[in-house]
Amino acid sequence: MLYLKYKRYIMDSIDSRGLLDLVKYPIITDKTTKLLEENQYCFAVDPKATKINIKAAIQYIFNVQVTGVNTCHPPKKKRSIGRFVGKRPHYKKAIVTLASEDSINLFPET
């Protein structure tokens, strides 16, 4: 019960001005399109963002109810340009689970 009160206090104290910068773009691959059937969406987020901040940002931007957030830091991939070898920039991936009645329209109809 104490944890719930603490978590609610954190959610109320988050500033909504910085939330738009946390979520960068949705990640759309074969695996993530399969996750859409389970009402899970995948986003690239700021590497310093916490799960609580990601949850608040998704709820604020898309006006949906988030039930869970899973995050991971994928390894950097090596890329070569000619004889020079470099690495892709670091990013953080968040898999967001929504309530059963909510959904996000990632593919708008034209």
UniProtKB/Swiss-Prot annotation:
Compartment annotation: Plastid, Chloroplast
An annotated Gene Ontology molecular function: structural constituent of ribosome
One Gene Ontology cellular component: ribonucleoprotein complex
SUPFAM superfamilies membership: Ribosomal proteins S24e, L23 and L15e
Listed transmembrane segments: none
Predominant place of localization: plastid
GO BP annotations listed: translation
Sorted UniProt keywords: Chloroplast, Plastid, Ribonucleoprotein, Ribosomal protein, RNA-binding, rRNA-binding
Any single Pfam family the record assigns to this protein: Ribosomal_L23
InterPro entries: Nucleotide-bd_a/b_plait_sf, Ribosomal_uL23-like, Ribosomal_uL23/eL15/eS24_sf, Ribosomal_uL23_CS
Subunit note: Part of the 50S ribosomal subunit.
Record-linked PANTHER family: 60S RIBOSOMAL PROTEIN L23A (PTHR11620)
Protein family per UniProt: Belongs to the universal ribosomal protein uL23 family.
Task of the protein: Binds to 23S rRNA.
The protein, known as: Large ribosomal subunit protein uL23c
Organism expressing this protein natively: Pyropia yezoensis (Susabi-nori)
Source species taxonomy: Eukaryota, Rhodophyta, Bangiophyceae, Bangiales, Bangiaceae
